Amino acid sequence: YQPSLERTSWFLPVAAMLLLFCSFGLAYPTDFPESLYPTSLVTHHSADIERGRVFTTDGWGHYLSFRYPEPYRIYIDGRADFFGERFTQEYLDTLNGKPGWQDTLQRYGVEMVLVPAETPLATLLRSTPGWRMVEETSSAVLFSSLVP
């Protein structure tokens, strides 16, 4: 017995389409809890963030890349493991306010910084000429460069 090609040829394409259709619903989360992401701050300053080059944490960068997929102007996101050791170390040094942090922000043309309020970088930017605090919440702070 040989099954008819006409009767079984539909199964594989239909199964593939169902798998593809179901995976789109799982590709990105539909909500980002305020307890983990600065969603209200980002929503409030959406127009500025969308236009600027943003330095943020890798986790928050992933959220921003979901919110603003084009043009991609975020320094780092959740794929940090793939950016290479040197780049990742540069990111960590900048976030921790180590020597050279200002050079990194200048080299990449960073216009906005969105970081947890307690990071060393946030502490430094609060007193660094050329940076203005836009808004601070209990968990996040947004800075804007005054240098075009």
Where are these regions (language model features)?
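Membrane-proximal, lumen/periplasm-facing interface regions of secretory-pathway glyco-
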Residues: Y1-I49, G59-G61, Y68-E70, A80, ...
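Short, solvent-exposed mixed-charge patches
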Residues: V147-P148
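Short periplasmic/luminal acceptor-recognition loop of GT-C membrane glycosyltransferases, typified by
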Residues: D48-E85, E111-A117, F143
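Periplasmic/luminal catalytic loop of GT-C fold multi-pass membrane glycosyltransferases
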Residues: R67, F87-L142
